[in-house]
Amino acid sequence: MGRKRSISMYGCFLAFGLSWSVVLMTSLPGNTADLQTIRDRGFLSVAVHDDRFPLSFRDATGHWSGFEVEMAQTLALDLFGKRDAVKFIPVANSDRLRVVADGQVDLAIASITATPSRSRWVAFSSPYYFERSAIVVQNNLPQNRPSQNSLVRTIGDLRGQSVAVLKNSSAMDALMSQSLGLILVEVESYAEGWSKLRSGQVQALAGDRVMLLGAMRKDADLRLLRYEFGLYPMAIAMPKGAQYASFREKVQGVVDRWQRSGWLKEQWQRWNLDS
């Protein structure tokens, strides 16, 4: 299954790579530091999530880890010659674009789906991963229906039920566009979504497939429904503006090299993203 997913993902890169580079690297005014200013400063400021295993997270000791963290550290190595020349800024889902557009960070590597509408606010690199959304339920949680006490097994079993979904997420947009009869409950974070699911406030949680699989590796009571939707190109968000063109070109050049060398594929395998 991993091999099939890797082949499919590389097909997505071939189809999307050029178009995203051309369409989403367009420029408008911004406030973030340019390449020379960043180099003079001596470190890269990167917005990331701190609770998205295996993409970006902090362990009990506060150590940063994950696929997107590895990307930021490898980018810092290319710019400054050392992996630790990066300052991680935890960011909420709803603030990912704003902190880049407002110049609070140099870029964001935070599970951001590159879309034409979002490109009005930031510029994007070509995709580094293609994600799908999925829905997870608790293994032994019955439907909340008086006349029925069977397990939730299909998406149809959730009709009329509450499903937690991250605010301003691609999963939210996709579910709202479908007529599934779900009661969508917005949450600010996955942590809030897990809390609502485990307490029975919602019957399911929708989100990035890789995030849900990561949680399932830690909790055997969670089960993924056989229903996936959407296909989202995840990309690095960078500032718009002609003055930042050299910075964007540098970042894009590194991403291109990751793709050509097979480094991205190695990282997918390392973090079990190709399963």
Feature roles, as predicted:
Residues 47-53, 89-94, 103-115, 138, ...:
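Beta->alpha turn/N-cap motifs
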Residues 170-185, 224-226, 255-275:
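Ligand-binding clefts/hinges and TM-proximal coupling segments of bilobed small-molecule sensing domains
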Residues 60-80:
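Short, polar/charged alpha-helical segment
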Residues 95, 111-121, 174-177, 191-231:
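A ligand-binding cleft/hinge motif common to bilobed small-molecule-binding domains
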Residues 50, 130-142, 209, 213-256, ...:
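Periplasmic-binding protein-like
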Residues 73, 77, 81, 85-157, ...:
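Acidic, polar ligand-binding/catalytic clefts
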Residues 42-67:
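Short glycine-rich His-centered loop
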